Amino acid sequence: MQTVHYLSRMCYTKLLMDSTRPLTVQQLSDKLTVPVVDLLLPCRFCSRFLTYLELREFDYKHLQLIWTEEDFVFACCSGCAYASAQFEIQQFYQLTVYGREIEQEEQRPIGQICIRCQYCLKSLDLIEKLDICSFNQPFHKVRNHWKGRCRHCKEIE
């Protein structure tokens, strides 16, 4: 029988006494010496515990854990990440540029511009950014941050 560890208040206190708060699931796992598969991290938005796959996706997307003033830690499940991304585009859309126009708008090279997926919030790597540029596809400025499509969401659409 596998033991599942819920992050108790005592664990948080130990974490804070040691040093800074972990920002990734893997850092939290290492800090607590609990395997990722045994972590129970609630979603900040729906309160559901993330599955093992969602915990791994969270780090793959380069998202950061959410810490409260009371030292509780939360993540964001895949469903809420999609919902949050759509809400932000609907409520805070600012501008669309195509392909390399983003470099003119930002006055820096594409590799230095932080861009997340407009659907799943994954941080785009350089290949994904260049792919969007080479096909002259859109980048959207939302809440002062750039959005585009990652390779996974591009295949689904």
Swiss-Prot record:
Disulfide bonds: none annotated. This is Protein E6. Forms homodimers. Interacts with ubiquitin-protein ligase UBE3A/E6-AP; this interaction stimulates UBE3A ubiquitin activity. Interacts with host BAK1. The lineage of its organism: Viruses, Monodnaviria, Shotokuvirae, Cossaviricota, Papovaviricetes. Plays a major role in the induction and maintenance of cellular transformation. E6 associates with host UBE3A/E6-AP ubiquitin-protein ligase and modulates its activity. Protects host keratinocytes from apoptosis by mediating the degradation of host BAK1. May also inhibit host immune response. It is found in: Host cytoplasm; Host nucleus. One of its GO terms (cellular component) is host cell nucleus. The keyword Membrane does not apply. It comes from the Viruses. GO terms for biological process: DNA-templated transcription; regulation of DNA-templated transcription; symbiont-mediated perturbation of host apoptosis; symbiont-mediated perturbation of host ubiquitin-like protein modification; symbiont-mediated suppression of host innate immune response; symbiont-mediated suppression of host type I interferon-mediated signaling pathway. Its main location: host cell. Gene3D superfamilies: E6 early regulatory protein. Belongs to the papillomaviridae E6 protein family. One of its GO terms (molecular function) is DNA binding. A zinc finger (unnamed) spans 43-80, 117-153. The keyword Aminoacyl-tRNA synthetase does not apply. SUPFAM superfamilies: E6 C-terminal domain-like. InterPro entries: E6, E6_sf. Keywords: Activator, DNA-binding, Early protein, Host cytoplasm, Host nucleus, Host-virus interaction, Inhibition of host innate immune response by virus, Metal-binding, Modulation of host cell apoptosis by virus, Transcription, Transcription regulation, Viral immunoevasion, Zinc, Zinc-finger.
